[in-house]
Amino acid sequence: METYKDSTQVSKSSLKKKIQGFGGFLSGMVMPNIGAFIAWGLITALFIKTGWLPNDNLSKLVDPMIHYMLPMLIGYQGGKLVYDTRGGVVGAIATMGMIVGASIPMFLGGMIIGPLGGYVIKKFDKAIENKIPTGFEMLVNNFSAGILGAALAIISYVAVGPVVAGASTGLGSIALAITNQGLLPLIAVVVEPAKILFLNNAINHGVFSPLGIEQVQHLGKSVFFLLEADPGPGLGILLAYSLYGKGSAKNSAPGAVIIHFLGGIHEIYFPYVLMKPFLLLAVIAGGICADLTFVLLKAGLVAAASPGSIIAILAMSPKGGQLPVLAGVAVGAIVSFVVASIILKGSKEKSKDNFEEAQNKMKEMKKESKNQTTANSENVKNNDELVSSDIKLIVFACDAGMGSSAMGESILKKELKNANIDGIKVQHYSVDSIPKEADVVFVQENLSERARKSAPDANIVTIKNFLDRSTYEGFMKKIKK
């Protein structure tokens, strides 16, 4: 019976990692191009007929950007994830065939054919490795990319494009039906727990963004851009901890409120929920009520808001659409706060041990980080050697490589500067894009396996909260010796 239980746990853990890996791959195609999406969203919000500054001439930018530029960028990034720049070029060529072969924006198509283009050229290069006559390398490399890219573009135009266009239209119809039937708020039952498992970027950019862009074509805005980006439920959790929490959780919550609500880094509140899993009820309740408010008030954004900051959300709101958006965010925050407050106050009265366990978890983070830096990989044999010669690159990695990891990078850079330690580069990356030459990698606990796969020779330091300075203090003590 014990063996069965263990194998089941391993199976669940493996499935979770696979889902996270797939989600990370999807978001990895979109996140580096978020600036382009924001540019398109701003131009749309400003210059279309119903925009803030209607301009028939400048509004001509809207359609080419959404039909050509954005899908091409996704296709290029998808190919690049599989096989660097060469894969990106073939992925972009293949995506172009799909764009021309369909009358709707091919975001889903770019996510499919871009990585496929990268995969095809990668396999081709491997097949002809060490078989090219000396002096013909450039000729073969250039023509192979051109020929394979052209072939994939034709296949995409003739066969794949129409199929994906049909699938995209079908998904759009399903999304519209769900909205019309009033079932959209129930999506929070899936979305909010999935966010806590670090699938937030995959959900937002892999699922909701394509659906949202499809809806924008018809309605000029979409509620799908708000479902994951809404900071309300997380804000309620942090406010409840600020008033009714204890110890380090209470002390750190007010600072986390600013980072979450204004900075848009939602990962900051995940550890607070993980400390008390019952708080999932609070974020789910807040999410349902917020989504219901969005639907009733016909709220929506013109493009994806990333990061999920209230500033970005308001910037992506259509003209006259700010109040419905703010109302939904406020309702989500209030409901989440009320439910979380009841849970926190109830747990204090009924069992102090529960909260003490949560505090012990926070203390364990410090011990764990100290042990992790010495035990995760046996490369850390002599701390003095690491300072003088071994550590050249420290990487902070999160799912998307743009939010919480950047905060950790900033904190450690200051620690190194204060300690007068030079010559160590500190950078942040997506967990699936960690450079092989990384010496030390700081990563969230449930992404550690993906980090080891990306950088097998690095020392992995697991961390629950990138704002927890105790981890960095322990690390600094070791490299100062």
UniProtKB/Swiss-Prot annotation:
Membrane topology: Multi-pass membrane protein
Disulfide pattern: none
Residues annotated as catalytic: C398 (phosphocysteine intermediate)
Domain PTS EIIB type-2: 392-481
Keyword Cell membrane carried by entry: yes
EC number: 2.7.1.197
Segments forming domain PTS EIIC type-2: 22-357
Biased composition (Basic and acidic residues): 354-370
Pfam family, any one: PTS_EIIC
Region (Disordered): 354-381
One GO MF term attached to the UniProt entry: kinase activity
Signal peptide (from-to): none
Stretches assigned to the Extracellular side: 56-59, 166-174, 303-322
Subcellular location: Cell membrane
Keyword Kinase on entry: yes
Record key words, sorted: Cell membrane, Kinase, Membrane, Phosphoprotein, Phosphotransferase system, Sugar transport, Transferase, Transmembrane, Transmembrane helix, Transport
Reaction(s) the record says it catalyses: D-mannitol(out) + N(pros)-phospho-L-histidyl-[protein] = D-mannitol 1-phosphate(in) + L-histidyl-[protein]
Subunit organization: Homodimer.
Function: The phosphoenolpyruvate-dependent sugar phosphotransferase system (sugar PTS), a major carbohydrate active transport system, catalyzes the phosphorylation of incoming sugar substrates concomitantly with their translocation across the cell membrane. The enzyme II CmtAB PTS system is involved in D-mannitol transport.
Protein name stated in the entry: PTS system mannitol-specific EIICB component
Record organism: Clostridium acetobutylicum (strain ATCC 824 / DSM 792 / JCM 1419 / IAM 19013 / LMG 5710 / NBRC 13948 / NRRL B-527 / VKM B-1787 / 2291 / W)
